[in-house]
Amino acid sequence: MIHYHCADISGDKFLELAGHHLLVSHAYPRRVSDAHDIAATMLLDNGAYTAWTVGKEVDWNDYYTWVEPWIGKYPTTWCVIPDIVDGGEEIQDKLISQWPHNNRGSPVWHLDEPIPRLLSLIDGGWPRVCLGSAGEYAEVASNGWMARMNSVFNKVDKTFGQMPWLHGLRMQGIACGRSSGNFPFGSVDSADVARNNNRKQNTITKMVTAWDKQQPRVPWRQRPEQRELADFTTTL
């Protein structure tokens, strides 16, 4: 599993990220050129989560223009196709249909959307599909979130027989077994290093190395699922 680390770090400490897999968000784009100079591979994020947290709309045409030179020059750079957190299926499908850069992007499936939509995206020829937390599953690692993720991976495993490349947006900690999660993503991302490297006990090199060593258990083994409340009410 690849760990993408947010590259929004100031000063010379940024260079300690050299040789690792890095992420630059459209919401914080200042390091995009520098990161391409030192990264093993690059992920360009659309900034949808940041926009959602502050109630801001994103100019997607600006995003298309921003990613174009990087995915054009660097074969190891990919990006997240625009999405709107809590936007609903119709809006998400429209944004995917408007994407101008073919399979250099990956679509987002939100946990509050129907699982068949995820299966359709996986089967649609995209190199990977991103999973994002939203709606009643907005809080990563909550009990409801964990139950939903177990259902998702159970269904994906049963449907395809082998695990496709799924990318966990903001799911690095839960994917690696620091809790009861341990989900076999192809890749995950996190801003942990960018946010917490200034703590006394931390260095960038130490943090990145520790994260990159953590890998989920494979293969996926079917897990017990919690029945939804609606399932009980329909049987009464």
Language-model segment annotations:
Residues 1-96, 216-236:
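Non-catalytic, usually N-terminal nucleic-acid engagement modules in DNA/RNA processing proteins
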Residues 18-21, 38-39, 75-76, 100-104, ...:
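Glycine-enriched alpha-helix->loop->beta-strand junction motifs that scaffold or abut catalytic
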Residues 27-37, 85-98, 113-117, 136-155, ...:
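Active-site-adjacent beta->alpha loops and helix N-cap segments on the catalytic face
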Residues 41, 96-103, 143-176:
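Alpha-helix-loop-beta-strand connector modules within alpha/beta enzyme cores
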Residues 45, 107, 180-183:
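Conserved, mostly hydrophobic/aromatic
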Residues 58, 113-124, 166, 171-187:
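Catalytic cores of alpha/beta
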Residues 107-141:
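Histidine/lysine/aspartate-rich catalytic loop segments that bind and position anionic ligands
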Residues 133-135, 172-214:
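Glycine-rich phosphate-binding active-site loops on the catalytic face of alpha/beta enzymes
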